[in-house]
């Protein structure tokens, strides 16, 4: 991977929002100490969803060292992230999601009270379909046929959609019962309401010595909501593509092979990415000629020049380029051999 800092992540989010401006971008963070600071950085990078993943979940293909020693409970990571986002006036801009051991309706309600609008249920759903958790998902030897391509083993699979539907029906019913007992009409009413939680004595000095009060701290959202009431796509600044696309579209409508030239600066990031989005929206999966649209640029290109670009778009640069040139790109990119990349 090439994500080593919040800045790298922000660039990836920017690129993804250029190739599909209608998609919500989510970032998964492993619950750990200090996750609040990271979550704030992710929110400032314009992510739409932040997933706080606890240490109890994970695929069977996960290394045993990761299963045993990586991460902390989702409750600790979620509350810290929720508190820091709220204190920095960022909480209402992003949707918080959590997973990693969510099994019951009670877990769902507690997650909501600790700040999550959404929860993920994966391992429990697999168990409902017949998974026995032998943790060899990557070996193609799943004995119950849940995770294998072996035809003989797949014959042993007994899972049906109804089993998963029943699981989530019972989870939803338990959520409804708990909310009814507490006097609330919807799950939204309890999001961020840590004041509804308290630590229960276990009757053992070793267990009661654990102080859970930091989990119950309720940060003041000020004038903002305690959660993201109306999930929306966080917008990022426009690129050079948006400025030049109207002219290109006019030429496309004339049904001609197009070749044009533009000046480019190092602040022009992800050039060619939004144009690829427009081309795909216009032509779909219809294959374009390799040199259908040829764009010539002169200057210093910013990061992600030609990222996620599609076949049929040709980008020629006279100058130099920054990081992430041609990331996951199917376009024809040309740069002079004397240019530093």
Which stretches of residues belong to each language-model region?
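Phosphate/diphosphate-binding loops
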Residues: 73, 83, 91-96, 103-128, ...
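Alpha/beta enzyme core
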Residues: 1-97, 106-118, 320-324, 330
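Conserved small/polar residues in nucleotide/adenosyl-binding loops
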Residues: 331-337
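Terminal amphipathic helices with adjacent charged low-complexity linkers/tails
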Residues: 188-235
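The right-handed parallel beta-helix/beta-solenoid scaffold, focusing on the short coil/turn
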Residues: 291-293, 311-313
């Amino acid at each position: 991977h090439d994500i080593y800092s919040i800045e790298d992540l922000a660039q990836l989010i920017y690129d993804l929002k250029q190739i599909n401006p209608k998609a919500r971008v989510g970032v998964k963070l492993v619950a750990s100490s200090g996750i609040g600071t990271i979550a704030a950085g992710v929110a400032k990078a314009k992510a739409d969803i932040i997933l706080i993943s606890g240490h109890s979940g994970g695929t069977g293909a996960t290394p045993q060292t990761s299963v045993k020693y990586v991460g902390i409970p989702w409750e600790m990571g979620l509350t810290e992230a929720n508190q820091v986002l709220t204190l920095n006036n960022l909480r209402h801009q992003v949707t918080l999601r959590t997973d990693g051991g969510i099994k019951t309706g009670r877990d769902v309600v507690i997650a909501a009270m600790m700040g999550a609008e959404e929860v993920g249920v994966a391992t429990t759903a697999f168990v409902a379909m017949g998974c026995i958790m032998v943790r060899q998902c990557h070996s193609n030897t799943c004995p119950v046929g849940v995770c294998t391509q072996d035809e003989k083993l797949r014959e042993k699979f007994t899972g049906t959609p109804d089993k998963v539907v029943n699981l989530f029906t019972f989870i939803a019913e338990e959520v409804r019962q708990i909310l009814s007992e507490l006097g609330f009409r919807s799950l939204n009413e309890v999001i961020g309401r840590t004041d509804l939680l308290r630590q229960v004595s276990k009757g053992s000095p070793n267990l009661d010595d654990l102080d859970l009060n930091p989990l119950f701290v309720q940060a003041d959202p000020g004038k903002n909501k305690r959660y993201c009431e109306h999930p929306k796509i966080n917008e990022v600044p426009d690129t050079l593509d948006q400025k030049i696309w109207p002219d290109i579209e006019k030429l496309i409508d004339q049904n001609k092979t197009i070749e044009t030239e533009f000046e480019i600066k190092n602040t022009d990031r992800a050039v060619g990415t939004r144009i690829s989005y427009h081309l795909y929206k216009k032509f779909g999966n219809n294959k374009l000629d390799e040199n259908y649209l040829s764009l010539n640029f002169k200057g210093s290109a910013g990061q992600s020049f030609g990222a996620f670009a599609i076949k049929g778009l040709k980008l020629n640069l006279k100058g130099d380029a920054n990081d992430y040139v041609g990331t996951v790109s199917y376009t024809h990119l040309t740069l002079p051999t004397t240019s530093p990349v």
